[in-house]
UniProtKB/Swiss-Prot annotation:
Protein encoded by which gene: ntnF
UniProt name for this protein: Polyprenyl transferase ntnF
Gene3D superfamilies recorded: UbiA prenyltransferase
Compartmental location: Membrane
Pathway(s) annotated for this protein in UniProt: Secondary metabolite biosynthesis; terpenoid biosynthesis
GO BP of this protein: terpenoid biosynthetic process
Primary location class: membrane
Protein task: olyprenyl transferase; part of the gene cluster that mediates the biosynthesis of the meroterpenoids nectripenoids A and B, as well as cochliquninone D and isocochliquninone E. The pathway probably begins with the HR-PKS ntnH that catalyzes two chain-extension steps to form a reduced triketide, which then primes the SAT domain in the NR-PKS ntnG to initiate three more cycles of extension to give a linear hexaketide corresponding to the polyketide part of nectripenoids.
GO molecular function, one term: transferase activity, transferring alkyl or aryl (other than methyl) groups
C-alpha cells in the first residue's frame, strides 16, 4: 500500500497516478517472487556448505549478502521488464493493470527508479559480498537486461531467463572462496535451476498464450502449442536428475534426500498433470506452488546444514 500522505491523482485518461504504490509494485515487493529468487542463492550456498562441511553460523553474513543482493536485483530487473513490456502489457488481460500501462507510474519515473535501483544493487553487492562476487554478478545483470528484449527477437526467451537464474548459483560458490576446479556441484545445480526455470516460466506463460499470440509476443509457450506438456515432462525429468546429481556430489544426508529431492520429484508430475492450458488461472496457481517449492528446498538444505553443525 502507498504510504500515508503519498501524492496521487487521476490522469487525463482516467487512470490513478500513485508513485509510491506504483514503484512498490514495479519492484514486486507485494509478492514473494523476490524471496523465491534469493532462495536459489541460498539453496546453492547450503549445498556448497554441506559438501565443504561448513557450519551454519559461518554462513550468516554470506546468507544476508545473498538476500540483499538478489532481492534488490530481482526487483530492479522486474521493473526493467515492465518498462520494456509496457506496450505489450497493455494488450494482455492479466498485465494491463500493471503500474505503467495503467498510468500509476510514468515512463520517466520508472526509468529514474530503475537507474537508482541498478546503482544500489551494484553498491550493496560490492559492500556485502566483495569484488569477486560483484564481478560474478555481471553476467546475471547483463542477461537480466537483455531478457525482455529477447521477447521481440527469439521464440525462446525462457531460455535466456533460465540462464539468468541458473547463473545465480555461481556467486555463492565464489563467496565461499571456491574456483573453477572441481566444479561438478555448481554445474549440476546450474543444470537443475536452468531446467526448473524454463519449466516454471512455461507454466506461467501458458496463462497468457492467447493474448501473446494476438500481441505478437515471442514465447516458447506459443511456439510449442499442444506440445507444451511434452516439453514440460522433459524439463521435469532433467531437473530431477540434476538435483539428484547435486545431492550426490554434496554427499547429502538422508534428510535432504527424503524431504528435499524426493518431495521435489513428486511435485513434478503433479504440476504437469494439474496444468490446464485452457484455464487461465491454472498456470498462475501452479507457478506459485513451484515458487514456494524453491523456498522449501532451500529451507530443507539449510536445515540439513544446521543439523550437521550441532
Amino acid at each position: 500500500m502507498a504510504a500515508a500522505g503519498a501524492r496521487h491523482y487521476t490522469s487525463k485518461d482516467g487512470s490513478q497516478h500513485d508513485l509510491v504504490r506504483g514503484i512498490w509494485k514495479l519492484l514486486r515487493l507485494h509478492t514473494p517472487e523476490g524471496l523465491s529468487t534469493a532462495s536459489i542463492g541460498w539453496l546453492a550456498l547450503f549445498f556448497y556448505a554441506i559438501q565443504q562441511q561448513l557450519s551454519f553460523e559461518s554462513l550468516r553474513y554470506t546468507f544476508l549478502g545473498i538476500f540483499a543482493c538478489y532481492q534488490i536485483t530481482h526487483g530492479v530487473f522486474c521493473m526493467w521488464n515492465d518498462i520494456c513490456d509496457r506496450d505489450f502489457d497493455a494488450q494482455v488481460a492479466r498485465t494491463k493493470k500493471r503500474p505503467l500501462p495503467s498510468g500509476m507510474v510514468t515512463y520517466t519515473e520508472a526509468m529514474v527508479a530503475f537507474i537508482i535501483g541498478l546503482a544500489l544493487s551494484l553498491g550493496v553487492t560490492y559492500a556485502m559480498l566483495g569484488e569477486d562476487v560483484t564481478l560474478t554478478m555481471g553476467p546475471i545483470w547483463g542477461l537480466s537486461f537483455i531478457y525482455p528484449l529477447c521477447k521481440r527477437a527469439i521464440w525462446a526467451p525462457q531460455a535466456v531467463l533460465g540462464l539468468t537464474m541458473a547463473a545465480c548459483v555461481l556467486p555463492p560458490w565464489v563467496a565461499l572462496g571456491n574456483d573453477a576446479t572441481n566444479a561438478k556441484l555448481p554445474a549440476s545445480l546450474f543444470g537443475a535451476i536452468f531446467s526448473w526455470l524454463v519449466y516454471l516460466d512455461l507454466i506461467y506463460a501458458s496463462q497468457d498464450r492467447p493474448d501473446d499470440e494476438k500481441a505478437g509476443v515471442k514465447s516458447l509457450a506459443v511456439f510449442l502449442g499442444d506440445k507444451l506438456k511434452a516439453c514440460l515432462t522433459v524439463l521435469g525429468a532433467l531437473q530431477i536428475a540434476f538435483f539428484a546429481v547435486a545431492a550426490f556430489e554434496a554427499s547429502a544426508s538422508s534428510f535432504l534426500w527424503v524431504f528435499g529431492i524426493a518431495v521435489w520429484a513428486i511435485s513434478v508430475p503433479w504440476s504437469i498433470l494439474s496444468l490446464n492450458p485452457r484455464d487461465r488461472n491454472s498456470g498462475g496457481r501452479i507457478f506459485l506452488v513451484n515458487a514456494i517449492l524453491g523456498i522449501y528446498l532451500a529451507a530443507v538444505s539449510g536445515t540439513d546444514v544446521w543439523l550437521s553443525s550441532r
